Amino acid sequence: MYSGGENAAPFNTLVDPAPRGHVPQMSEKNTGEKGGGYMLMKPLVETAEKLGVRAEYDLRVQTVVVDGDRVVGVVAKRYGKDVAIRARKGVVLAMGSFAYNNEMVRSNAPRIFGHPAASIEAHDGRAIQIGQALGADTAHMDATEVAFFCDPQLMVRGILVNGRGQRYIPEDTYPGRIGQATLFQQDNQAFLVIDEAAYEEGMNAESSSAQLRAQPSWVAETVEELEGEMGLPAGSLQSTVDLYNRHAAEGSDPVLGKKSEWVKPIVGPFAAIDLRGRTGGFTLGGLKTTVDSEVLHVSGAPIPGLFAAGRCTSGVCAGGYASGTSLGDGSFFGRRAGISAAR
């Protein structure tokens, strides 16, 4: 599968796109609390336990224990009580990002401050703070990704316009790119304009994001009427739709480059979905590590006995995100962290 907009403009005009993303084939897939993370961790933990590894549950690490300059264990909370655990060879931090730590977000990634975090509340930045307390260095703490909460099956069949009634991004690109463009460049103002036939087609299409489908916020027989209902500048949406339809009649989108398979004239009845504020950010920066997942001190030297992986580190996607990168990053460097700690 395509995972980061590589098959959309402008990237598909620069390099021939290739689907390099992978969807794990899992039986009885779930969403929610027993969704992605749970389904990935369950077989890993079960396999480890069969090999004799002891698993502890309902623990929340508070700090690490240091003997001299070496990390030798952790102190955690379980049901309000402290639990100390000795680590003979090392401690691996894999506790998520800081997307739910408002103060850390305000200080390091203010562009997403005040917007819903597209992650779970356990992403509180504690692992980063634990590392920093030992003098650990960090990198790309301002790096973020922005999710956009709308079903792509609807977006590709309509046009996304900003608060001035203008299109600003190809609707068939990676939703993360749409999220960043909407929040950072359009003041979080976005509307999906779509006609009745395209809306019904999108609602009936197979989708991995059906929970993100939305009902129209406004409906009208003409674009002029819809424009007025939406409170857009007079004539702005009309000119946008007219230009889009002129080229769509020939199956092209020379303005933004949406692929021809999704380009069709928008004809009445018309609808618009209010997508203002439908963005949620998460953080990509974190602890600086080596290729062996050793946490680096600000001096540049590894902190003995301390390793880290996943979103609490500044991984491969700090400069930009693609779907699944956190899983790839976390699993690859998590394995390297385990190997390094076991030496």
Describe the predicted segments one by one:
Residues 1-16, 218-237, 242-243:
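Rossmann-like flavin
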Residues 1-82, 102-104, 248-267:
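Conserved redox-cofactor binding core of oxidoreductases
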Residues 35, 78-148, 327, 333-336:
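Glycine-rich loop(s) and the adjacent beta-strand/alpha-helix scaffold that form part
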Residues 65, 161-162, 289, 296-297, ...:
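Hydrophobic alpha-helical segments, especially N-terminal targeting/anchoring helices
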Residues 124, 128-130, 137-236:
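An anion/pyrophosphate-binding glycine-rich loop and adjacent beta-alpha core
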Residues 128-137, 233, 238-241, 248, ...:
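Internal hydrophobic alpha-helix adjacent to the cofactor/substrate pocket in enzyme cavities
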Residues 147-154, 173-179, 278-284, 311-327:
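Glycine-rich phosphate/pyrophosphate-binding beta-alpha loops
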Residues 236-320:
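A glycine-rich dinucleotide-binding beta-alpha-beta segment and adjacent secondary-structure elements
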